[in-house]
Amino acid sequence: PKANKLELLVDTGQLIGAIKRTSVFSNKASCLIVLRIIRDKLTVFAQDIDFSTSAEETLEVDFNGNEFSIGINGSLLLEILSCIDDGRTRLSFSEPSRAILITPENQSGNEELTYLLMPMTIP
Protein backbone atom coordinates (compact mmCIF):
# COMPACT_ATOMS: atom_id res chain seq x y z
CA PRO A 1 0.00 0.00 0.00
CA LYS A 2 1.32 3.41 -0.95
CA ALA A 3 -1.56 5.57 0.23
CA ASN A 4 -0.94 5.17 3.96
CA LYS A 5 -1.05 8.84 4.94
CA LEU A 6 -1.52 8.39 8.69
CA GLU A 7 1.73 7.75 10.55
CA LEU A 8 2.35 6.83 14.16
CA LEU A 9 5.78 6.87 15.80
CA VAL A 10 6.06 4.93 19.04
CA ASP A 11 8.81 3.71 21.35
CA THR A 12 9.34 0.07 20.33
CA GLY A 13 10.07 -1.24 23.84
CA GLN A 14 7.06 0.51 25.38
CA LEU A 15 4.74 -0.87 22.69
CA ILE A 16 6.11 -4.40 23.14
CA GLY A 17 5.53 -4.15 26.90
CA ALA A 18 2.00 -2.79 26.51
CA ILE A 19 1.04 -5.54 24.06
CA LYS A 20 2.50 -8.26 26.28
CA ARG A 21 0.61 -6.99 29.33
CA THR A 22 -2.75 -6.44 27.62
CA SER A 23 -2.74 -9.49 25.35
CA VAL A 24 -2.97 -11.72 28.43
CA PHE A 25 -6.61 -10.55 28.54
CA SER A 26 -7.35 -11.06 24.83
CA ASN A 27 -9.31 -13.93 23.37
CA LYS A 28 -6.89 -16.87 23.12
CA ALA A 29 -8.21 -17.96 19.70
CA SER A 30 -8.01 -14.60 17.92
CA CYS A 31 -5.37 -12.70 19.97
CA LEU A 32 -7.31 -9.55 18.97
CA ILE A 33 -6.07 -6.28 20.39
CA VAL A 34 -7.39 -2.87 19.45
CA LEU A 35 -5.13 0.12 18.86
CA ARG A 36 -7.00 3.38 19.52
CA ILE A 37 -5.19 6.58 18.67
CA ILE A 38 -6.51 9.96 19.78
CA ARG A 39 -4.16 12.84 19.06
CA ASP A 40 -0.82 11.82 20.58
CA LYS A 41 -2.09 8.97 22.78
CA LEU A 42 -2.18 5.31 21.79
CA THR A 43 -4.42 3.01 23.83
CA VAL A 44 -3.74 -0.71 23.53
CA PHE A 45 -6.96 -2.55 24.45
CA ALA A 46 -7.69 -6.28 24.77
CA GLN A 47 -10.84 -8.05 25.86
CA ASP A 48 -12.00 -11.62 26.29
CA ILE A 49 -15.80 -11.54 26.32
CA ASP A 50 -16.04 -15.24 27.26
CA PHE A 51 -14.26 -14.65 30.58
CA SER A 52 -15.36 -11.01 31.11
CA THR A 53 -11.78 -9.75 31.29
CA SER A 54 -10.17 -6.74 29.66
CA ALA A 55 -7.11 -4.53 29.91
CA GLU A 56 -5.89 -1.30 28.42
CA GLU A 57 -2.71 0.68 28.50
CA THR A 58 -2.00 4.16 27.12
CA LEU A 59 1.28 5.33 25.57
CA GLU A 60 2.55 8.71 24.38
CA VAL A 61 3.12 8.70 20.61
CA ASP A 62 3.60 11.03 17.66
CA PHE A 63 0.59 10.83 15.32
CA ASN A 64 -0.23 13.01 12.33
CA GLY A 65 -4.00 12.36 12.44
CA ASN A 66 -6.87 13.00 14.82
CA GLU A 67 -8.57 9.74 15.76
CA PHE A 68 -8.14 6.17 14.51
CA SER A 69 -8.93 2.63 15.72
CA ILE A 70 -7.80 -0.66 14.25
CA GLY A 71 -7.94 -4.30 15.35
CA ILE A 72 -4.87 -6.51 14.97
CA ASN A 73 -3.49 -9.86 16.03
CA GLY A 74 -1.34 -8.99 19.05
CA SER A 75 0.94 -12.01 18.78
CA LEU A 76 1.76 -11.22 15.14
CA LEU A 77 2.54 -7.59 15.99
CA LEU A 78 4.81 -8.75 18.83
CA GLU A 79 6.66 -11.02 16.43
CA ILE A 80 7.21 -8.13 14.01
CA LEU A 81 8.29 -5.69 16.74
CA SER A 82 10.82 -8.19 18.10
CA CYS A 83 12.65 -7.98 14.75
CA ILE A 84 13.00 -4.18 14.92
CA ASP A 85 16.25 -3.06 16.55
CA ASP A 86 15.49 0.66 16.36
CA GLY A 87 14.25 2.49 19.46
CA ARG A 88 11.16 3.80 17.65
CA THR A 89 8.80 2.13 15.23
CA ARG A 90 6.65 3.71 12.50
CA LEU A 91 3.15 2.33 11.86
CA SER A 92 1.50 3.66 8.69
CA PHE A 93 -2.28 3.45 8.19
CA SER A 94 -4.81 4.45 5.59
CA GLU A 95 -8.07 3.09 7.00
CA PRO A 96 -9.11 0.37 9.50
CA SER A 97 -9.77 -2.21 6.79
CA ARG A 98 -6.41 -1.78 5.03
CA ALA A 99 -2.99 -3.23 5.79
CA ILE A 100 -0.60 -1.57 8.25
CA LEU A 101 2.99 -0.90 7.17
CA ILE A 102 5.49 -1.28 9.99
CA THR A 103 9.06 0.01 9.68
CA PRO A 104 11.88 1.11 11.98
CA GLU A 105 12.04 4.90 12.30
CA ASN A 106 15.67 4.83 11.14
CA GLN A 107 16.63 2.23 8.57
CA SER A 108 20.16 0.93 9.17
CA GLY A 109 22.92 0.08 6.73
CA ASN A 110 22.09 -1.07 3.26
CA GLU A 111 18.90 -2.97 4.10
CA GLU A 112 15.40 -1.62 4.35
CA LEU A 113 12.83 -3.42 6.52
CA THR A 114 9.10 -3.16 5.81
CA TYR A 115 6.51 -5.39 7.47
CA LEU A 116 2.89 -5.71 6.45
CA LEU A 117 0.15 -6.61 8.95
CA MET A 118 -3.46 -7.17 7.97
CA PRO A 119 -6.12 -5.81 10.33
CA MET A 120 -8.87 -7.76 12.06
CA THR A 121 -12.52 -6.81 12.42
CA ILE A 122 -13.37 -5.15 15.73
CA PRO A 123 -16.58 -6.71 17.11
Question: What are these language model-derived features?
Answer:
Residues 3-123:
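DNA polymerase processivity clamps
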